[in-house]
Amino acid sequence: VSRHWPRRLKEELDARGLKVSGGTAFGALHRHGAWDSMLEHVRQVAALTAAAGAHHLVLIPPMYRDEKTGAFTESPELTAEQWAGFGRAADRLGRLLLDEYDVRLVLHPHADSQIQTQPEIERLLNESDSRYTNLCLDTGHVAYGGGDNLDLIRRFGERVGYVHVKQMDPAVLAQVAAEDLSFGEAVKRGVCVSPPAGVPSPAEVVAELAKLDAELFVIVEQDLYPCAPEVPLPIAVSTREHLAGCGLSGTRRPNVPQ
């Protein structure tokens, strides 16, 4: 990243009246030998994130299956040794980001990664320090891994630092389990759907988040690939209207219907 990029990014955002909620990077905290290269990449993203005035960095673990071929590239489960160092590595990175960039680390569970199921998410949270490592709750990926979003919010609400709202089609999830599909193939089959279809219910998620004593960025997503360029905009409009009906809008705190 050129040393001029952070300044240029800030200028371009300001010229368009845009604000950035956070940065996103991919990184393997369980691969001890990859720390230096991972940190170099994350530092570049953190510098741009801070320059844009944002204070969150979403870290997504690598997938253990090739997204295009479905081939396994490593074990779906971490070894005891890898787990032993995972929380420490996350905290080390989170502390560095906070001290040097004033950016908070939030880890993002992801389909076909070793942080996918609810037990894996809970283990990550239990083995890390809330001062440095917290959760980007992606409701769709949690559902994909068989987790309970509402339960996670209720029991680990203080660790939810950032949110991605997304819904999954239960029928396609059943195909994933029955046919051992990769996430890439699941997306091609339409696993990500627009509300009110799919799980979890956005209304229930918003209502549970509203109970937290926290101000959170909630990013609305729907994975669509491949897709024609004209497809996303109508979906974005209808999704915005539905979520507004659930009480989620541009306000600082959800106005949940009683």
Regions found by a protein language model. Give the residues of each.
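Conserved, mostly hydrophobic/aromatic
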Residues: L13, T49, L105, D138, ...
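Hydrophobic faces of well-ordered beta-strands that scaffold small-molecule active sites
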Residues: V20-A25, L57-L59, L105-L107, T133-L137, ...
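Acidic/histidine-rich catalytic cores of soluble enzymes
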Residues: G87-V199, L248-R253
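C-terminal/domain-terminus segments
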Residues: L216-C246
